[in-house]
Structure formats: C-alpha cells, structure tokens
Curated annotation (Swiss-Prot):
PANTHER family: CHROMOSOME TRANSMISSION FIDELITY FACTOR 18 (PTHR23389), DNA LIGASE (PTHR23389:SF9). It comes from Bordetella bronchiseptica (strain ATCC BAA-588 / NCTC 13252 / RB50). DNA ligase that catalyzes the formation of phosphodiester linkages between 5'-phosphoryl and 3'-hydroxyl groups in double-stranded DNA using NAD as a coenzyme and as the energy source for the reaction. It is essential for DNA replication and repair of damaged DNA. Its EC number is 6.5.1.2. This is DNA ligase. Residues 618-696 form the BRCT domain.
Amino acid sequence: MAQAGPTPQQAIARLRAEIEQHNIRYYVHDDPSVPDAEYDALMRDLQALEAEHPELVTPDSPTQRVGAAPLAEFGSVRHAVPMLSLGNAFDEEDVRAFDKRVADTLRGAGLLGLDQQVEYFCELKLDGLAISLRYEEGRLAQAATRGDGQTGEDVTANIRTIKGVPLRLHGAPRVLEVRGEVLMNRAEFERLNRTQAARGEKVFVNPRNAAAGSLRQLDPRITAQRPLRFFAYSWGEVHGLPEGMPTRFDEPAPGVRVASTLPRDTHGGMLDWLAELGLPVNLRHNHRERGADGLLAFYERIGKLRADLPYDIDGVVYKVDALPSQRVLGFVARAPRFALAHKFPAEEAVTQLLGIEVQVGRTGAITPVARLAPVFVGGVTVTNATLHNEDEIRRKDVRIGDTVIVRRAGDVIPEVVGPVLEKRPADAREFVMLTACPICGSAIERPEGEAIARCTGGLFCAAQRKQTLLHAAGRKALDIEGLGEKLIDQLVDADRVKSLADIYSLTAFELAALERMGKKSAENLVAAIDQARRPALGRLLFALGIRHVGETTARDVARHFGSMERIMDASEEALLAVPDVGGVVAGSIRRFFAEPHNREIVEQLTQQGVHPQAEAEPEGTSLAGKTFVLTGTMPNWTRDEATRRILAAGGKVSGSVSKKTAYLVTGEDAGSKLTKAQELGVPVLDEDGLKALLGL
C-alpha cells in the first residue's frame, strides 16, 4: 500500500523550518548555506502553499518577516518602521507581471491614465549588509542591522568608524531614519585579504562577507581598520521637518489632499534630498524608466556594466517613483508592493586549469577537482571547481594546462564548463584516474556500469570517516549545530573520533582544548550533541550514511518498520515491501547491517543514550503514491521547483520512466523519456497540465 504524502500543514511546517535555518545562516552568521536561487524557490513554494491555505498562515512564518533573530553579543534595536526585503524577479515575465499589477492598481485608484505608463526609479542592488541609521536633532544617535526586519543589532559604535557616514547632518528633520547598504569595494577586499593572509589570519570569501564580518566586530577598533563604504537608498521614520520648510501635500486619490511629513514627492527626489543633507547616495547609475520595456532596458544596460563597477551588485531594483502612488500600492507582510528586485544570473569567467586533484567522499566516491588560477566570478575569487567524474572530463575534453570557462553555478558552486580550444597549449595533458586512494592507499575501483570510481578503504580511510561524520552532523540528519568540517578534521586526525558513537562521548573539557574552541563554544557543542540523542528514526538512519539511502528513503523505511531493531533485522524481501524501495536500496541496507562493525556502531549509540523516535505517518493527499518523471526544460518552472511542488503534494519523483510512472512531465528537448512513455502508455503533461493537476 502506498505511503500517504504530507498534509499541507506538514509541508508548510517543513518549508518554514528549512527556510528559518537558511535565514539564520545568512542573516545572523553571514554564511549562506544554499544558493540564492534555491532559497528563493523554497520561499516561493511556501508562499504558494500559504496562498492555497490562508488559514495556515501564522505571524511567525518566514513569509511574514525577514531574516533571523540577532546575535546575543550585540544590543537589540527595535525598528520604528520595519526593514522589509523586496520581492524578486528572475526573468522578463516576472517584470512584466509586476508592471501590470502596479499599473492596474494605480489606474483603479485614478492615479494613472489608460494611455500612461508607470514611472519607476531604477537603482543598483548593492551586495552588502543592510543598515539603518537614526539621526536625532541632526546627530547620529543609533545604527542597527536589519536583523529579522523588526529587531536588529545595535552597531552604532562600528558605524561611527566608517568615514563616509556623517556623524551630523545640517538642516535635517528632528528624527530621520536612513536605510542603506554597507559594502566593500573589490580592490579594497583583495587588499584586505592579502593583509589577512600575510598575518596568518582568516581571509574572507567575498566582499559582502568581508563587509558583514568587519561591521559585526565586537571591537570597533577592528572595524575602523576596514575599508567600508555606506550608500543610502531609502528612509524609515521621518518626523519634524526644519522650520521654514513649506508643508507639502500629497494627493493619494483625486480630490484628496494629505499633509506629508516628507520634503519631496518622489523616491528619486528623496534620494537627492538625502544627498543634499550630506549622506552618501549612489546616484551615478540610477535612472528613471517608464513601463516594463524601460525596466528591462535598464537591467540589460547595467548587466553590461556589472563587471566594470568597483563593487559587487547582484541585480537591480525598480521602485515606483511617485510617493503617493507608493502609499496606494502599500505593502504585503514581507515586502512593498511598489518595488521589485531583478536578480542577475550566474557569471562565467575564463582562467587556466593548473591541475586536477581528487577528493574522497563519505561513500568513497572519487571526485576530480580542478585547481585553477584565481579568477573572480559570481562575486567570489574561485581557485577550485568541480569536474564531477572521469567520464565528464572526457566528454568535455578538459586537459591540464587548458584555458577553461568557469561558471559559478547557482552563484555558489563553481564548475568547469569546458575548454577554450583555440588557446590549448601544445603540452596540455589528459587526466589519468589514480589507482590508489591518496588518503589511505587503498585500491580505487570503478564498478561496471557506474560513472564514479570509489576508494575501497571504507571507514579505514580517514577521508571517508570525516565525510561520514560531517554528513551525520548535518541539518538533514542529526542537526548537531557547531560540529563542522574543521572540528571533525581535528577529532579524526587525533584519533579521538572513529565512529558516529564517539561523538556522543565528547566532553566540554576536551573540546575546549581544540583549536578555535573556547569554553563557551565547547559547552554549546556538548549541549547540541545532547539535543541529538532523541532524533527521528529516519534522521538517524540517514545519518548512518548507507549508500543509496537518501533522506526521503530513510524516512519511508523508518515509517514502515518503526524501530531501528526491526530495520536491522529486516530481510531483503521485507525491505522490498517498503514503497519505492527497489533491489539496489534493499540490498544496500541489508549489506550495511550484515556488517558486524555497523551493528556495533548502532549498539554503541544506544549505550551513549541515543534513542530514536518513531516517524509519524503522514495523512493522505490526492497525489499520494503517484510517481512523476520530469524531462526537458519547462518554460517557467525549474525542474527543482516542479519536484518540490510534487513532493509537497504527496507525490514522488523518479529519474526514469517505467510501468509504475503515473505521469511524465515534459518541456522542450524531452528526448528518449517521452518516447518510452508513449510506448508504455504513460500519460504526458506539460507545465500547465502539471499546474492544473496540482490545483495551481
């Protein structure tokens, strides 16, 4: 019998939890855990589900606020006017839809004629840290980070060290709250990293990371040494215009006049006013445009200038210029209706392939990695990029010494796209796969029919042991916060941790003695380990790192059997009774628990007080148990987005067409899967058909 998929409430809860974790990494720790595109897709999925089920919307949903709570080390500041984020556009269709919504609303309010186009103020989307500056009686009184949009961190002392931030404004209102971005120029970033490296100190990943880390120093003297810049781009609370400044009236509707607290009636005019007060405003590339065509032309123009700018941008921002129109359009909980951020795609660059090394994964997978001459791409300096596997290297004809195209896929994971053949040197060398593991010396074998070669050393191999532990501590497994790669490296290298069970015997005393671990950090890690003593059964099964057993399969197996003991003792036939578990997965689980060492680890976990909790059965949905296969390129949804929506509705997604396939979803260049589906009589849907099936 097919297992029921998650209810809308469960799907929403899962998405909220995942987004909140990403928010903490991005907003609090300045350490993004996923590409922007993946985060945006998660947020769109949650917004879609909440739109379908408004009764499930709660005030603490990520769609109702921005970011995450501030760190405890800084004082908290409550924003008088919330610091909202912006809605995102990723393609032309999104921009045109935004312009149409704005125009329709303004025409309905009598503020735009039928033959008129909306006028927008277009700006660069600076890639730094959002900051609010509060001036009282013309003096800088307080500075705060965005935080969660409602409450931020007090960074006044650090902001005062930035030379471009005025400590006093002349002719300012009694209260003026200025919003803007703190950033670091690329040239200054490179210079800072060279200095850091020469001192043996931490180097930063990119200018945004450097700016955020510099601003959030507890010691303002460190911030003062960093080359930070500030640009104002908006405002919050404004009260008490100076005497002598005439009162200005807005007309939010025909015949209605309202006194305004602002000295100008357009967004661009307000930025000019802020500049007149002495605040740094990035006016050089800002421009007014009309209608969607004007917005898209601005986007294209800035895209061509992007590489020549002295600082990083990750898109452009469109704002309705007229402030009365902005007030009519208003806000949703998370973003203004009158503004939109249009993001740039990933970047590509050309550099030299200096060499190819291999990395050993937790299952022994050998992954070739390109060592590159440093190149700035997608906002970071890239020196390594994935080559995936030996077959991929052959397919792309990449050779050591080649000039190669590097793409920062998803703006996070760099990959080698291919060689520039006309620049290939005469001494370019082909890659030859190693025959022995570079870490443990065990034989490297490539099973017949597989693309990936593997080290045969198992947990004897320190590299596999490290990756296994890192996997187990991860967010989708045991979620042990603070147990990261560098700490695991130290524990394995010292032979202190040989298996997952050893993690639970660690003490704060011995952890505090490790590099970069103080007493408080050690105590926090021990507390996180203690919290992981009662994981969901599926999480613990996933944490064991059984080959072919992913997060979803682990959860399905856990729900089917109910206890680790029953899973360990299950025959291959019993495992095959679990929906969507085939011979490969069943055999892999059976072989894993047939190994005495692995059973011993589970017993050791029990002795360390690890008691997994049974998985709850999900309630049924209309797509529960139905298997989908995706092929080709859909016009609007990415494959990942379509997959997430199917899973959220209770369906399953497979990589190959079979008699068990309920639907094949196709886009352009569908290929052989479409042919096979037609042969088997599998129903075929396009993107619109899938949306209809999902009730969208």
